[in-house]
Amino acid sequence: SGGPGTGKNHLAAAIGNHLLSGGHSVLVVTIPDLMLRVRECYDGGQSEASLLDDLCKVDLLVLDEVGIQRGSSGEKVILNQVIDRRLSSMRPVGVLTNLNHDELLGALGARVIDRLQMDGGMWVNFDWGSYRKNVSHLRIVK
């Protein structure tokens, strides 16, 4: 958890790249993109069950931008299903969010937060300022 630009995605990418180099599968998906994929299921694309199976097959799933939409009930159900299935299968899931613990608890519910803390799951605070202003390729050249 942490504000924008604090390195949450950077750390998740480093972990993912390390796993990929060892032959593991990794999927990083934003919640808005995931919910778009779920809506596409209703329009006759992939079945929702098949989508959930795909999300549960990868060795590491990272859910990004959790809580950015302040969770509809449908979003809560999907996230609950994904997290529940992955943890029941002993497969890790990373959650990246700008929300603090209490805000995420409100967005996802106590059941999901409790499950995420099972088997050594931990909350990591990125409690420093944004680093983006220091990144040269993002600066405007005049």
PLM region descriptions:
Residues 60:
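Walker B motif beta-strand of ABC-family P-loop ATPases
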Residues 1-12:
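Walker A/P-loop nucleotide-binding motif
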Residues 11-15, 46:
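Generic detector of contiguous secondary-structure segments
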Residues 20-57:
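Short glycine-rich substrate-engagement loop in P-loop NTPases that contacts/grips substrate
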